[in-house]
Amino acid sequence: MAKVPDLFEDLKNCYSENEDYSSEIDHLSLNQKSFYDASYGPLREDHMNKFMSLDTSETSKTSRLSFKENVVMVTANGKILKKRRLSLNQFITDDDLEAIANDTEEEIIKPRSAHYSFQSNVKYNFMRVIHQECILNDALNQSIIRDMSGPYLMAATLNNLEEAVKFDMVAYVSEEDSQLPVTLRISKTQLFVSAQNEDEPVLLKEMPETPKIIKDETNLLFFWEKHGSMDYFKSVAHPKLFIATKQEKLVHMASGPPSITDFQILEK
């Protein structure tokens, strides 16, 4: 089993070359002895050739350095390949860690843009109706119909497509998105498909009129994606979830199989 040799000694040398580091972050502990004397055990096999954080909650009781300030990549033989000192309160993802290893230049990683639910200033403006009275069939050739037990939809195999729900698809546009957001409204009504959480049934939400601007009601919006002959509707409010069907289950939100997220749009 490989052991990590003197990681903290390496960091000590790094800090000693930059003595004014402590003045930049005045809340960090300056007791180097308690920090560098921290004990560490053998490197576990599942940590070899992977990124490790010097999280001092596991190595030192007095230091306040955290995962967000120092990231180190260590090989199986304990060699430090890269060190990165990051700014405080910076959100780090696995993709950011991959960037540390792949970048030839050392630089501070910029935080990613906010999730859609936090972009409260994003406005989606009405563009035009792009489909009228269309039918949605899933990959099993089931059509979307109303479920009369409540404001829900379900999928069923129909002999007569006149029994299927007819949808109007309305396109919207915003400055922030390159994808095409749409709403799905039951034709000749003001009932709009509204996304919910994963595995929860979509709801039919009644609006007083077709919205000209959508800002807070992003549950009504779906990014329409087309791959080959199949169509997909990804929630703007929940970007990992799609409108989906499943046998003996209401139309709901899902990230993929075993639910069916593939649809075909059938024109009137």
Swiss-Prot record:
Compartment list: Nucleus; Cytoplasm; Secreted
Organism superkingdom: Eukaryota
Alphabetic keyword roster: Acetylation, Cytokine, Cytoplasm, Glycoprotein, Inflammatory response, Mitogen, Nucleus, Phosphoprotein, Pyrogen, Secreted
Propeptide residue range(s): 1-112
CDD domains the record matches: beta-trefoil_IL1A (cd23295)
Sites of N6-acetyllysine modification: 82
GO CC, one annotated term: nucleus
Post-translational modifications reported in the UniProt record: Acetylated within its nuclear localization sequence, which impacts subcellular localization.
Signal peptide: none
Modification Phosphoserine occurs at: 87
SUPFAM superfamilies, per database record: Cytokine (SSF50353)
Residue ranges of the region described as Nuclear localization signal (NLS): 82-86
GO BP annotation list: cellular response to heat; cellular response to lipopolysaccharide; cytokine-mediated signaling pathway; fever generation; immune response; positive regulation of cell division; positive regulation of gene expression; positive regulation of immature T cell proliferation in thymus
A Gene Ontology molecular function term of the record: interleukin-1 receptor binding
Positions annotated with a glycan in the UniProt record: 102, 141
UniProt similarity note: Belongs to the IL-1 family.
Subunit note: Monomer. Interacts with TMED10; the interaction mediates the translocation from the cytoplasm into the ERGIC (endoplasmic reticulum-Golgi intermediate compartment) and thereby secretion. Interacts with IL1R1. Interacts with S100A13; this interaction is the first step in the export of IL1A, followed by direct translocation of this complex across the plasma membrane.
Record remark on domains: The similarity among the IL-1 precursors suggests that the amino ends of these proteins serve some as yet undefined function.
Protein name as it appears in the record: Interleukin-1 alpha
Source organism (scientific name): Capra hircus
